Curated annotation (Swiss-Prot):
Keyword ATP-binding in record: no
GO biological process terms held by the UniProt record: negative regulation of DNA-templated transcription
Name this protein carries in UniProt: Heat-inducible transcription repressor HrcA
Similarity comment text for this entry: Belongs to the HrcA family.
SUPFAM superfamilies tied to this protein: GAF domain-like, Winged helix' DNA-binding domain
Keyword Repressor: yes
PANTHER family: HEAT-INDUCIBLE TRANSCRIPTION REPRESSOR HRCA (PTHR34824:SF1)
Superkingdom of the organism of origin: Bacteria
Annotated keywords: Repressor, Stress response, Transcription, Transcription regulation
Role played: Negative regulator of class I heat shock genes (grpE-dnaK-dnaJ and groELS operons). Prevents heat-shock induction of these operons.
Bilayer-crossing regions: none
Conditions for induction: By heat shock.
Length: 325
């Protein structure tokens, strides 16, 4: 446990280090933060914080920088304060859904970019899991003689678009007939479905197309639960370039792999969660990930992540995510 004065000094060191990217000395602390104590007292308190492993000295500077443990203590205090705050929730996602004609993928793509522009960090948005949602309708639209667009409408009102190649050109009337058949059979995806398809179709090519349609639809819905939309990838590269060029490649490999999806899906809490450095992975000591949930409605929800260097503006990011519903 640290004293109130030590906490104030630690907060000042963290915030100055994040703002300026340089180790912080006692003289700088007094000048920037109007601390009403002597430089000797500040140095003594900093020595105590260093002994507790909250700050550390670099070889090239007489100042101190926050350790991972120091960042963790600082973040825990922020999270504790945030949990007691009442904020007006933003429903930007619902606006984006309407603007994108209820196409979830398009809305999430815009959402990831907007979050990145606001936070000035790289963002990831995980596609919601449709297990709690029910397919209401399937519409087929002929884009050209050999390409059909399948529009899947869920009970929540959300829409997914899937491109489907066709070996033969179907008329619009035939596609409407197939759409109605598939929609009517949505609740009957069982062992009798294949018999129904055989009875319904008028050619082997129709049978092949309908089976392909059903398999594609099921695979798309399953795969979408693992889809991740990234915004502002270059922001992470720029931030890491300033601190540690050698760390960029393993970090990019991590956030572009299934491991990041697994990490985000494992965080099921609706509360804001912060993982710092090695808490994420032993090879990722230079980044932090702040996660939260977003909602389209009470049942359809997914994960948001903001990724940046360990010297992140945590307060700004936490306040931003705390306002998202």
């Amino acid at each position: 446990m640290i004293t109130d004065r030590q906490l104030s000094i630690l907060n000042a060191i963290v915030e100055d280090y994040v703002d300026f990217g340089q180790p912080v000395g006692s003289k700088t602390l007094i000048e920037r933060h109007n601390l009403n104590v002597s430089p000797a007292t500040i140095r003594n308190e900093m020595k105590q914080l260093e002994d507790l492993n909250y700050i550390e000295k670099t070889h090239s500077s007489s100042g101190r920088s926050p350790s991972q443990l120091g960042f963790r203590y600082y973040v825990n205090r922020l999270l504790e304060q945030t949990s007691h705050q009442k904020t007006n929730k933003l429903r930007r996602l619902n606006q984006l859904l309407v603007e994108n004609q209820y196409d979830v993928s398009s809305a999430l793509t815009y959402f990831a970019d907007e979050l990145s522009n606001i936070s000035q960090y790289t963002t990831l948005v995980v596609h919601p899991n449709h297990k709690q949602d029910i397919i209401n309708n399937v519409h087929l639209i002929r884009a050209n003689p050999n390409l059909v667009i399948m529009v899947i409408v869920f009970s929540s009102g959300h829409v997914e678009h899937v491109h489907l190649a066709s070996d033969i050109p179907f008329s619009n009337d035939k596609l409407n007939t197939i759409s109605n058949f598939v929609t009517n059979k949505l609740t009957e995806f069982n062992q009798n479905l294949q018999d129904d398809i055989v009875s319904f179709v008028q050619s082997e090519q129709e049978e092949i197309f309908i089976n392909k349609l059903i398999n594609t639809m099921n695979n798309h819905i399953s795969n979408q639960s693992n889809s991740i939309y990234m915004g502002g990838k270059v922001k992470l590269i720029d931030a890491l370039n300033e601190s540690n060029v050698s760390s960029i490649q393993p970090i990019l490999q991590y956030i572009e792999s299934n491991r990041i999806a697994e990490l985000l899906q494992d965080i099921s809490s609706p509360n804001i969660n912060v993982k710092i450095g090695n808490e994420i992975d032993d090879s990722l000591s230079d980044i932090s990930i702040v996660t939260s949930q977003y909602h389209f409605d009470e049942t359809l929800k997914g994960q948001i992540a903001v990724i940046g260097p360990t010297a992140m503006h945590y307060q700004n990011v936490i306040q931003l995510l705390n306002r998202i519903w």
